[in-house]
Amino acid sequence: MFDVTTKYLASAFVDAESIEYEADNLRPLLDALGDSELSAQNLVQITQSGLKKRFRFEHIGTGDDLQLLGDRFDVTRKHKPPDGENMGDVAAFCEQAAELLSGSLDHFGRKAHRLAVVIDGLLTDLNENDFVVLADRLLNAPDLGGGPPFEWNWRIATKIERSFGQFADETNTLVHIRRARVTMSALGQPLFEGDTIGVSLDINTNPENKAARYDSDGIRAYLGEVSTWMDDLWNRTNSFMFGE
């Protein structure tokens, strides 16, 4: 999809303000998640009522970060230098995220009211002419009296009804494209430095519907379909960007 995939994020928005870290609940929660490679980590969330300790786990193999916050449960996977081999494809990530999110919600007897998946990546194999052509296509920018723009942002959002499991819900579908200079390094050694196109793809259900309705089956259904939606979204975006 991208030259470098930098982040996957899967989120289940849930009323979980009352769920705080308790040592006595750590082992039962780990048993419910059923993954021996999860390691408990420290997490303190700043809330309107003060600091609260929350559950957090890191997956030893993939580096997935599971955070059970007061208003959302997140699974995040970030690119590990030098080669990002931990990222895998989005379908495999969503499959693992579905188990972590649904296991967490089931353990605490909760349902989510909103679901979201975000993919961030970089296009690095571009020359200066590619940047100029892309800026012309996306921006229709005014002539400011200098050279072509070296930094810019472009963003679009639309609503699409999508079916998954027993649900047919309206989703927000967003694409964010930006030019920026990026430096990537590992152990103090530079891996990449230069201009890139950053792309963020985001598909999430209607934030205005606060009804707790997504149980574990709903989460698995959503995350089982979203990789296909993301592939289609990227194909449409890539075709628009480069005319391919």
Q: Residue spans of the language-model regions?
A:
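Long, compositionally biased interface segments
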Residues: 190-244
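Amphipathic N-proximal alpha-helical interface segments
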Residues: 56-80, 182-207
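N-terminal low-complexity, intrinsically disordered segments
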Residues: 1-83
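Aromatic/basic-lined ligand-recognition segments
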Residues: 115-200
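Macromolecular interaction modules
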Residues: 1-15, 170-175, 201, 206
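Internal, hydrophobic cores of structured domains that mediate oligomerization or house catalytic pockets
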Residues: 71-143
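Short amphipathic alpha-helical segments
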Residues: 25, 89-100, 218, 222-225, ...
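Short glycine-rich, low-complexity/disordered patches
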Residues: 39-52, 102-126, 145-161, 228-244
